[in-house]
A protein has these predicted regions:
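Cap/insert and terminal regions of metallo-dependent hydrolase folds
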Residues: 64-117
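Core dinuclear metal-dependent hydrolase active-site scaffold
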Residues: 17-75
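Active-site HxH/HxHxD metal-binding segment of metal-dependent hydrolases
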Residues: 1-21
Length: 117
């Protein structure tokens, strides 16, 4: 049986704010807003030793704010999780298909590829 996770101590918790940098060790982290159907979703850009890495998951659509924040990154992690044509053919209910492909749902594989290029 898996061991139950221990409670995270309050000293190891930190509230973060969109567009306000914070640090963990020598890594500066900048949270940036992303469109998704959740409370205050964000992506992150990490800076250390003159290097820049960006991470953004659960993106409903690509926008100028995301592009601005990931621009110049040496490594970009974007989540994309559907092909529009395959999604159309699934047995998912219309409401779920609409949520996935909607402006606050998820990024298609095609849009993620176009963004990286």
């Amino acid at each position: 049986m898996p061991k139950q996770s221990e409670k995270i101590s309050d000293s190891n918790k930190k509230n973060i704010a969109i567009d306000e940098k914070f640090s963990i060790g020598d890594i500066e982290i900048l949270p940036f807003s992303i469109p998704h159907d959740a409370a205050n979703p964000c992506g992150y850009t990490l800076f250390s030793d003159n290097k820049k890495i960006s991470i953004a998951t659960d993106i409903g659509h690509m926008n100028n704010n995301i592009i601005k924040n990931i621009d110049g990154s040496e490594f970009i992690l974007l989540e994309s999780n559907y092909d529009p044509e395959v999604l159309k053919c699934t047995k998912y209910p219309f409401k779920l298909k609409s949520r996935i492909a909607g402006p606050t749902g998820h990024l298609s594989n095609q849009v993620a590829g176009q963004t990286i290029n």
